[in-house]
Amino acid sequence: MLKMESTQQMASSIINSSFEAAVVAATSTLELMGIQYDYNEVYTRVKSKFDFVMDDSGVKNNLMGKAATIDQALNGKFSSSIRNRNWMTDSKTVARLDEDVNKLRLLLSSKGIDQKMRVLNACFNVKRVPGKSSSVIKCTRLMKDKIERGEVEVDDTFVEERMEIDTIDWKSRYDQLERRFESLKQRVNEKYNNWVIKARKVNENMNSLQNVISQQQAHINELQIYNNKLERDLQSKIGSVISSIEWYLRSMELSDDIKSDIEQQLNSIDHINPVNAFDDFESILRNLISDYDRIFIMFKGLLQQSNYTYTYE
């Protein structure tokens, strides 16, 4: 069964994208402030801080754990999701979450983020309008609930304040943005060129590997053809040897029983598989040698009974 881990992969991708966004935000802020910086140093510091915060806060493990639970549910394993559901509906869990929220509120207040800032941030979102300098303020779900509960009032008192207009050096701003754009353009071009070089090397390696595979395949085909030819030649030779032995056997003055026995052994030889044919030949030769040995023993016994001696020449 195919194991699905798409949710974990997506969660990991989101975490990695968040880190890249943090690096871009840090470098952009430094450039807008006109501060000289080393990109590698900023990258290393942001990565170290990002990894520490994500690990120490438990956010990364929490996200990956929930993603793993979803993947297990998609794979048909619901035990983890059932435990999570029971845990989320437990009164102890709710009490602990409420305690954590209170601690976060105290921490934000100690950092100078008061209730006004927290409520406004939770009630509104700002959406940029593409191609325009204006933006759209969007109400969140919390703001909608407050309106429905009558917790929103309209203040009709207006305070007229004198707006001080600062002189903005648009030329320096433009030059700064142009330098930033050129820097980003150069960085993108370098990465693109590096990727092109790597892609060409990979393509060359693939072509070389394909050529080697083609050559090896051609060599294998040649060996297969030669092997088939050799097998056919052996089959033909085996058939010729059997026919020659049968013809020679018929010209002998042996009894019909002996001839029939030898012919049966010859007919039992495998004509298709040369390996089996050689085994059959070996068996026939062993039988012939065994028969010759028995005949020699009988002949030697007759000579001894007749008081004759024999010698080898």
Curated annotation (Swiss-Prot):
Signal peptide: none annotated. Residues 208-313 are annotated as: Interaction with host EIF4G1. The keyword Coiled coil applies. It comes from the Viruses. GO terms for biological process: regulation of translation. Residues 150-206 are annotated as: Dimerization. Keywords: Coiled coil, Host cytoplasm, Host-virus interaction, RNA-binding, Translation regulation. One of its GO terms (molecular function) is RNA binding. It is found in: Host cytoplasm. Residues 170-234 are annotated as: Interaction with host ZC3H7B. The keyword RNA-binding applies. GO terms for cellular component: host cell cytoplasm. Residues 166-237 form a coiled coil. Residues 1-149 are annotated as: RNA-binding. Plays an important role in stimulating the translation of viral mRNAs. These mRNAs are capped but not polyadenylated, instead terminating in a conserved sequence 'GACC' at the 3' that is recognized by NSP3, which competes with host PABPC1 for EIF4G1 binding. The interaction between NSP3 and host EIF4G1 stabilizes the EIF4E-EIF4G1 interaction, thereby facilitating the initiation of capped mRNA translation. Homodimer. Interacts (via the coiled-coil region) with host ZC3H7B (via LD motif). Interacts with host EIF4G1. Belongs to the rotavirus NSP3 family. HAMAP family: ROTA_A_NSP3 (MF_04094), ROTA_NSP3 (MF_04090). This is Non-structural protein 3. It comes from Rotavirus A (strain RVA/Human/Philippines/L26/1987/G12P1B[4]) (RV-A).
